[in-house]
Amino acid sequence: MKKPFEVIAIIGKPRDQQAIQTHRELYQWLSTEGYQVFVDDRLATILDDIPQEHFSSLIELGKRADLAIVVGGDGNMLGAARILSRFDISVIGVNRGNLGFLTDLNPENFQSALTDVLKGEFMEEERFLLETEIHRHGQIKSHNAALNEAVLHPGQVAHMIEFEVYIDDSFAFSQRSDGLIVSTPTGSTAYSLSGGGPILSSSLNAISLVPMFPHTLSSRPLVVDGKRRIKLIVSPDNRGTQEVSCDGQISLPVSPGDEIHIYQSPNVLKLIHPKDYNYYHVLRNKLGWSSKLF
């Protein structure tokens, strides 16, 4: 009987010793189980007991592996997702971070849960990403993707900025605020939630627009269909340089008068979970949301 996964990638970056030990234990255990295992080359100097030919770049891992195991917190998963979503590869996480909303597996007993996953006992869901383009004088000046959110904000100095929002080229609203969070369902439990945005079920094909400290009494978050294209036109009268932040990890400079185009990526992240995964249990467990009264 053919295994669901033959080639497995272990992904992470140098962190604390506990995380490094988890990488090492994963490699040894998977190799013993007969899998072909490759490791993120950012760990090559730390894990010097692993043969050098077993290290590859993130792009090469995406091409070669059937399954990627991301060790770390949600930040590691977000960084890996922007690249791995380009390839036909399933992804699961071992939590070595703080919240671990996207990384399901407990590092203390990952073998038990992974054994079932490697037998094919798992559930899979596709999480879409957002593509963000900065247009200046009719040309694309910069571009990146985000699994959680794309955020227009003033940059290093907090002050209000002015911009207009268009949905499928139809004017929606204008705003003076500290910025705007454009979030996927995956990101709805992250920065968007802190900004007062709605929690979107992870399977929804929807995008939320959450104003940041709007200078009005009537502004509210807006949820639109996931296939809609969002265009933000930054006022030419804004002071200084603004930015668009992708997942809080990539910054794209924005000048007054620029257009920001945000739309659903054609790529998806194939995220897998153990069979007993329950989204609402994660909400309660990680966010302390709506515990049962009786």
From Swiss-Prot:
Keywords per UniProt = ATP-binding, Cytoplasm, Kinase, NAD, NADP, Nucleotide-binding, Transferase
What organism is the protein native to?
Answer: Vibrio atlanticus (strain LGP32)
Enzyme class, top EC level, equals: transferase
Cite the active-site annotation: 74
Q: Reaction(s) catalyzed by this protein? A: NAD(+) + ATP = ADP + NADP(+) + H(+)
Its biological function? Involved in the regulation of the intracellular balance of NAD and NADP, and is a key enzyme in the biosynthesis of NADP. Catalyzes specifically the phosphorylation on 2'-hydroxyl of the adenosine moiety of NAD to yield NADP.
Q: Where does NAD(+) bind?
A: 74-75, 148-149, 159, 176, 178, 189-194, 249
**Entry's PANTHER family?**
NAD KINASE
- Entry EC number(s): 2.7.1.23
- Report what the protein is called: NAD kinase
Q: Name one GO biological process term.
A: NADP biosynthetic process
What cofactor does its activity depend on?
Answer: a divalent metal cation
Task: Please report which protein family the annotation says this sequence is part of.
Answer: Belongs to the NAD kinase family.
Upper classification of the source organism reads: Bacteria, Pseudomonadati, Pseudomonadota, Gammaproteobacteria, Vibrionales
Which GO terms of the molecular function aspect are on file?
ATP binding; metal ion binding; NAD binding; NAD+ kinase activity
A single GO CC term for this protein reads: cytoplasm
Keyword presence, Cytoplasm: yes
* Classification via NCBIfam families: PRK01231.1 (NF002306), PRK03378.1 (NF002893)
Q: Does the keyword Transferase apply?
A: yes
Q: Which cellular compartments is it found in?
A: Cytoplasm
